[in-house]
Amino acid sequence: MMNNIHLNKILILDFGSQYTQLIARRVREIGVYCELSHYDINSDFIKKFNPKGVILSGGPDTVTFDNSARAPSIIFDLNIPILGICYGMQTMAIQLGGHATSADKHEYGFAKVRSCNYSPLLNGINDGGDDLLDVWMSHGIEVKRLPDGFKLIASTDSCNIAGFADINKHYYGLQFHPEVTHTKQGKHILERFVSDICQCKKNWTTDNIITKLVKDLKNQIGSANVLLGLSGGVDSSVVAILLQQAVGKQLTCVFVDNGLLRLNEGNKIMQTFAQNMSVKVIRVNAQEKFYNALSNEDKPEAKRKIIGHAFIEVFEEEARKLNNIQFLAQGTIYPDVIESAGTKSNKTKVIKSHHNVGGLPNSLQLTLVEPIKELFKDEVRKIGVILGLPTHMLNCHPFPGPGLSIRILGQVKQEYVDILRQADTIFIDELYKNNLYNTVNQAFAVFLPIKSVGVTGDARRYDYVISLRAVETIDFMTARWARLPYDFLDLVSNRIMNEIPRISRVVYDISSKPPATIEWE
């Protein structure tokens, strides 16, 4: 009998830290399901979610201000373990009667923490003995007075209260960040909290997830037929195989060539599915429809929503040609939901609408099926490995549903698409040739509709600009710009400017996420 993968779960309340998604990844790596929600989530949701424990993330607020963020008071009435990290520790202290103030010495970066006084959270965990831990600190506020019933469990030379605990209530606070890799024993500490203190069983495994997803798809779809919007990427391809296992011939895949794909991508996708997967795939050439819909539109959010609406119109047109199509399946993943919905908060601003989340029309005639919307990208890839997806497909960099439309700043024109395709092809080809493709997690070119002065021979030129973007990331929620070799960038830049007549300048994007997003629009 399959274990219930959602029976034991952790709720992570997000106070805005750049590391919050890492907490979720670490908890899931332990084998326990968790969800992210904004700190102001309503009490009814928390009760219904019924977590085995709560983690309060760090955040940028100054906890001593009267209007700073606070944890929902209900979590202290649920009789479940709570772990506060950095800001989460500080607000827990204040809300339970303690006191925090500006630190005498701010701590940013590596620090050594000494654990003291027995606690189930830190007991026996150290780096080389003497109860010392190498950790990552990032704070200018510190707890100065413990709430009643709490005791000190960790300190540094600069921060006397670097950890506290109310062992009877299973409340814990850490001023350092156990979720980041710089804290060497961080995963061990989180596992101690999740597995031992919260007593969560490790049911969140790839095999269990696959079994649950296939079962749920069978129950949801029944004897009806389902249409899948197939992009050729990992996400929709994994959904295709899951649906094939669940409902077999009831599945029809529709690959929409919207004229915004990379060079020869449509043919490559059709060939891959014909050779590796026995699913029915219909190719729809809809370039004219998408270009007309995008005509004169220059706003990123509007472009995403236009793309989403156009896709749905195509899918509904195809559904009418087939029999008994009641469901539309998509490869929506958890980061799409988080960025589009603001982790279920009424206050959080949407970063960007994903075409398959925020871009869907309210008048959708088909019932939506999103089997992997709870999964991070690396979890989807693990499922793909077990399901037998081709290696080249699993290792292929993500490509956004709106395609090149959001890699062209402003209006989308055929001329811009053609230029961008050439530049992107050169960049990716050289990454492969120089054995660099698999050292980065996503790489692409961006077309900038601005012109820059250049020189060709003795002549002045005034043409467009291309930006190259490459990042390293685990879950695509945070990302570090890739330090590609200068000689390589020089090679790519020269090829682009020499081989594409309308490009006079190439730049390299050195923005990390946050504060930037991976895609430019």
UniProtKB/Swiss-Prot annotation:
Quote the record's binding site residues for ATP. Answer: 231-237
Q: In which pathway does it act?
A: Purine metabolism; GMP biosynthesis; GMP from XMP (L-Gln route): step 1/1
Q: Which key words are in the record?
A: ATP-binding, Glutamine amidotransferase, GMP biosynthesis, Ligase, Nucleotide-binding, Purine biosynthesis
Q: Where is the GMPS ATP-PPase domain?
A: 204-396
Catalysis performed (reactions): XMP + L-glutamine + ATP + H2O = GMP + L-glutamate + AMP + diphosphate + 2 H(+)
MF (Gene Ontology): ATP binding; GMP synthase activity
| Residues of the active site | 86, 177, 179
Question: What's the top EC group for this one?
Answer: ligase
Recorded GO cellular component terms are: cytosol
Please tell me whether the keyword Hydrolase is annotated for this protein: no
Tell me which CDD domains the record gives: GATase1_GMP_Synthase, GMP_synthase_C
Q: How does it assemble?
A: Homodimer.
Q: What does this protein do?
A: Catalyzes the synthesis of GMP from XMP.
* This protein's name: GMP synthase [glutamine-hydrolyzing]
Species this protein is from: Vesicomyosocius okutanii subsp. Calyptogena okutanii (strain HA)
Q: Which gene encodes it?
A: guaA
